[in-house]
Amino acid sequence: MSILSALTSISNPMKSSNSNVANGGSKLSMGANSVACGSCGGGNSSSGIINNSDGSQTTYYTYTSPTYQYGYTYSYGSSFSSSSCGCN
């Protein structure tokens, strides 16, 4: 099984680590499995925990800055993982 077919065979591997940008790109918040990389300069960052209806918990990170840095990480078994950080 190739990595591509392995990834497409599992149910939405990025669902728990999605991100969204709001307020003209000045705010970035990310869901579970996210890794905070820090800001690119200026602004504030914070994190917290959301209690989900199914009893699980989601840790979120929020950055408020003109420029921000974001990161995520996820894994499939022990054979595949990915992470990324960048500034926008």
UniProtKB/Swiss-Prot annotation:
Region (Disordered): 1-22
A matching Pfam family: Coiled
Top-level taxon: Eukaryota
BP GO annotations: sorocarp development
Entry's family note: Belongs to the hssA/B family.
Name under which the protein is recorded: HssA/B-like protein 6
Species in which this protein is naturally found: Dictyostelium discoideum
